[in-house]
Amino acid sequence: EAAKALNKFDIEIIEKHHNKKVDSPSGTAVMIANAVKEIREQSEFIYGRHGRTGKRQQNEVGIHAVRGGTIVGEHSAIFAGNDEILEINHSARSKNVFAEGAIAAAKYLVNQESGFYNMDDMLG
């Protein structure tokens, strides 16, 4: 919804995880980027900005990964407009939040017919 309401704003996604995480960007960062692309179909994902020169293009969605220490997981979606910035952030301070989500998903799935389900189905 933010991508739709703030359609003239630049979007950058930043995710941070511990130094043992092997994938980059994280699945959650990719999910956020794909949600933006559903609204802004012309979006072009830019993974980092190293070596890029020139002005930022309107359709760019920057995706950045940070790895260090024992960061469990942090995700930020930055909407940068003229003279204002809106950020949506989520920080997981322990892996318990993921375990709770997995348990909730299992409880949902046990009552469903065989098939493929996603978070939208569960959150309904």
Which residues fall in each region the model found?
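Rossmann-fold NAD(P)-binding glycine/threonine-rich loop
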Residues: 1-2
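C-terminal substrate-binding/catalytic lobe of Rossmann-fold NAD(P)-dependent oxidoreductases
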Residues: 7-124
